Regions:
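Generic structural signal for well-ordered alpha-helices
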Residues: 1, 24-28, 55-63, 156, ...
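Structural preference for beta-strand elements that scaffold enzyme active sites
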Residues: 10-12, 34-38, 73, 92-93, ...
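The substrate-binding groove and active-site-proximal loops of carbohydrate-active enzymes
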Residues: 10-17, 42-53, 69-73, 138-147, ...
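C-terminal domain-boundary segment and adjacent tail
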Residues: 4-11, 149-262
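Active-site beta->alpha N-cap acidic-glycine motif
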Residues: 1-33, 82, 144-145, 150, ...
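Acidic (Asp/Glu)-rich catalytic clusters
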Residues: 1-8, 20-40, 119-125, 155-164
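A cross-domain feature marking catalytic cores of carbohydrate-active enzymes
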Residues: 13-17, 39-43, 75-78, 95-97, ...
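Active-site-adjacent pocket scaffolds in enzyme catalytic domains
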Residues: 64-164, 252, 257
Length: 263
């Protein structure tokens, strides 16, 4: 948090409720400093979406943590998702998808650099889906062995050109803060700070920096006020559940700046 605060940024932290020590004091401290705390699955075992019955049971437990933590945001471990089942969660938004990422265990991508809305079959319940639009730090630095921020910079510039949303997922446990030899998956935190500095310096005064909950609130207002929207078209790049929801007209894609944000 110190690193981001020094550069004028804030972010959201998502914690796995079971199997990890997540104290109320830690969550309160995060929120008190202007950051956000959300729920990251139930356990980090890759089994959350194995069966609909199993998810239904686990969703009850997840909702308990959402209420206890006073959180309205959810993130699935390993970016696994079923956007229809997630409607069982009492959330305002979810961040379990990505615009494009061939290195994730679940196939299919969303193919857009904008948030969108998922509606229940009755049309009353909905949540905002906020896909990440920049490669994860683990993919770039730990898996692919990149040593510069060139990929981030190139993608960010493309997003800006198309008036889209820059959403980056990082893992602080991979940050190497002292440049000493750590575990093999660590990378210098300077790569992250250099990217934040690039954003701040090149695009000063040109971006709206908010927490995910604020982004979700913005798009929720658009949903309830029947703001201008564009329906997504089913595509082979999407997972089967996403294609089904689109065909049922339960997915609404927003383009608030009137630009073409499809990849």
């Amino acid at each position: 948090m110190d690193v981001e605060e020094q550069l004028g940024f804030r972010s959201a932290f998502y914690f796995v409720p079971r199997g990890y020590a997540v104290s109320p004091e830690l969550r309160r401290h995060i929120v008190s400093r202007g950051f956000e705390a959300g729920v990251h699955g139930l356990e980090h075992d890759g089994k959350l979406y194995n069966t609909k019955k199993g998810f239904k049971k686990k969703s009850t437990e997840i909702n308990k943590y959402l209420k206890e933590w006073n959180s309205n945001g959810f993130s699935s471990p390993c970016m696994q998702h079923n956007l229809e089942w997630i409607l069982d969660l009492n959330i305002q938004y979810d961040i379990s998808t990505y615009d494009t990422d061939p290195f994730e265990p679940q196939g299919g991508c969303i193919g857009t650099i904008f948030p969108f809305c998922i509606q229940g079959s009755s049309g009353e319940k909905y949540y905002v889906e906020i896909p990440y639009t920049l490669p994860q730090d683990f993919t770039l630095f730990s898996l692919m062995g990149q040593t510069t921020i060139d990929v981030w910079v190139k993608k960010l510039d493309w997003i800006v050109e198309h008036g889209g949303m820059a959403h980056l997922k990082t893992h602080p446990d991979y940050f190497n803060f002292d440049n000493k030899n750590g575990h093999t998956e660590e990378y210098p935190v300077s790569l992250y700070t250099n990217f934040l500095e690039y954003i701040k310096n090149k695009y000063a005064g040109q971006y709206w920096h908010v927490l995910p909950k604020d982004m979700a609130q913005f798009y929720s207002a658009g949903t309830t006020n029947n703001a201008a929207r564009t329906p997504l078209t089913p595509s082979d790049i999407l997972c089967s559940t996403c294609r089904k929801l689109i065909k049922q007209k339960r997915v609404t894609f927003f383009m608030p700046f009137g630009t073409n944000g499809h990849e």
